[in-house]
Design a protein with these regions (language model features):
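A short core secondary-structure module
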Residues: 1-17
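Glycine-rich beta->alpha junctions and the first turn(s) of the following alpha-helix
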Residues: 20-104
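Alpha-helical interface subdomain recognition
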Residues: 67-177
Length: 177
């Protein structure tokens, strides 16, 4: 058999849990990063999560994280589009992407169909970003600077997303490009 990773749900307030803040990333400074150290942390049986840690938690997390990032950025673009009087079609397309993101968020994050649909969502998102590029000149400097800084978040796991998409297509028996 295959080795199994066990995962536990541990509160950051548990005795023996220490979080050391790390230097922030060059984008989205509102999201903190840190290193966790566990020293003699006591676990109860109910703290151990069921199933295989890698298969059931770590692997699906990347997909769930992608969906949260897309939702957050789409929400931001929607707000900017309304505040700055962008064309209504931009707001409508962005609202559609938000609805699609929500729909995918309730699907199985391990399913090839979810990854293929996520690939389509990402393509639509890229088209929206291209279409809105000139509109950023109509927003205030602070908002535009924040967007330029934070849009790098979309590139963080693009290679991993591309590999998951390729794997999903191969599970359907096609390497369709």
């Amino acid at each position: 058999g295959r080795n199994m990773i066990r995962m536990a749900l541990i509160s950051r307030s548990n005795a023996g849990v220490a979080i050391q803040a790390m230097t922030g990333l060059p984008f989205v400074p509102e999201i903190s990063h840190g290193t966790v150290t566990f020293t003699d942390v006591r676990l109860r049986d109910e703290d151990i999560l069921p199933g295989d840690g890698y298969r059931d938690y770590i692997r699906p997390f990347r997909t769930i994280e992608d969906l949260h990032v897309f939702a957050a950025i789409a929400g931001f673009i929607f707000r900017v589009s309304l505040l700055h009087g962008w064309p209504r079609v931009v707001s409508e397309q962005t609202a559609s992407l938000i609805a699609c993101t929500r729909a995918l968020s309730v699907e199985d994050p391990s399913s090839p169909a979810t990854h293929i649909a996520l690939g389509g969502l990402q393509a639509q998102f890229s088209s929206l970003l291209s279409a809105t590029a000139p509109l950023w000149d109509t927003v205030d400097e602070k908002t535009r600077a924040g967007w330029e800084r934070d849009r790098a978040l979309l590139r963080v796991s693009e290679n991993a997303r591309a590999k998951r998409l390729e794997t999903a297509w191969s599970r359907f028996g096609t390497g369709q490009a």
